[in-house]
């Protein structure tokens, strides 16, 4: 998209944000978080270009890049995502937000909900209201991932210093306090392709069980959405996100004060 531009939220070359579309008159923003096993430089905010083109122009759209392993370890990836969101909240007045995360981007989206617990000493609010969360073929329980796919320990060990660190990485694998960001009235979508060659449905089922145990409403969508790196390009996934956008825009319009 030729109209997009890049922003820096830190000194590292990877601490960048792609602004796909921004209009101060828009009331809803989507922030995309890419996957790539915390380490693959081939996965970037550019992954979502095709998806953005299928979404309504009445929303702001941003993509986040973050530092990769093994150069950095957990929780540096989350620190970067938090910093990027804070940058957008401060400089672009982003308030009503939907997060879309793919693979470990979904992990990071989940971690955002407990960012104060995972990042000790960070007590300040992010300045956003979470309107919807879309988890695409995500990783939610790292210990269970390694148990199911022992060879995946290679990239997990690059991203985390110790086993204890990745056991405590998300609220699904470790008991954590209530979320630091409210998900009340937040639309939550769990999306999993049955054609994913890298992740079985187990991670999505673990996440669904977690949300059910917390009595948090969600929608689960299993379908033939393509291979792991095709899910976020699939037209049916774009439709699911568009529907979540529509529900939120309707609510925001109704909530606007009348002149």
Curated annotation (Swiss-Prot):
Keywords: Hydrolase, Tryptophan catabolism. InterPro entries: AB_hydrolase_fold, BD-FAE-like_dom, GDXG_lipolytic_enzyme, KFase_ver/fungi-typ. The active site is at residues 103, 196, 228. It comes from the Eukaryota. The keyword Transport does not apply. The keyword Protein transport does not apply. One of its GO terms (molecular function) is arylformamidase activity. It catalyses: N-formyl-L-kynurenine + H2O = L-kynurenine + formate + H(+). A motif (HGGXW) lies at residues 34-38. It is an enzyme of class 3 (hydrolase). Gene3D superfamilies: alpha/beta hydrolase. GO terms for biological process: 'de novo' NAD biosynthetic process from L-tryptophan; L-tryptophan catabolic process to kynurenine; positive regulation of cell growth. Homodimer. The main chain amide nitrogen atoms of the second glycine and its adjacent residue in the HGGXW motif define the oxyanion hole, and stabilize the oxyanion that forms during the nucleophilic attack by the catalytic serine during substrate cleavage. This is Kynurenine formamidase.
């Amino acid at each position: 998209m030729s109209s997009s531009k890049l922003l820096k939220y830190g000194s590292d070359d990877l601490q960048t944000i792609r602004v796909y579309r921004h209009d101060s008159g828009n009331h809803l923003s989507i922030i995309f978080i890419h996957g790539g096993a915390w380490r693959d430089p081939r996965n970037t905010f550019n992954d979502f270009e095709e998806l953005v083109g299928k979404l309504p122009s009445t929303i702001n759209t941003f993509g986040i890049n973050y530092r990769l392993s093994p150069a950095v370890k957990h929780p540096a990836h989350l620190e970067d995502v938090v910093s990027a969101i804070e940058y957008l909240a401060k400089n672009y007045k982003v308030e009503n937000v939907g997060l879309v995360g793919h693979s470990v981007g979904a992990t990071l989206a989940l971690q955002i909900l407990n960012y104060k617990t995972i990042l000790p000493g960070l007590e300040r609010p992010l300045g956003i209201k979470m309107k919807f969360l879309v988890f695409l073929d995500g990783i939610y329980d790292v210990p269970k991932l390694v148990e199911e796919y022992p060879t995946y320990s290679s990239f997990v060990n690059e991203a985390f210093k110790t086993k204890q660190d990745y056991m405590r990485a998300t609220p699904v694998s470790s008991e954590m306090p209530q979320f630091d960001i409210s998900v009340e009235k937040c639309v939550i979508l769990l999306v999993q392709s049955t054609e994913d060659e890298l992740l079985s449905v187990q991670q999505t089922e673990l996440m669904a069980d977690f949300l059910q145990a917390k009595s948090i409403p969600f929608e689960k969508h299993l379908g033939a959405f393509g291979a792991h790196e095709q899910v976020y390009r699939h037209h049916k996934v774009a439709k699911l996100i568009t529907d979540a956008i529509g529900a939120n825009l309707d609510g925001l319009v109704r909530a606007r004060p009348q002149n």
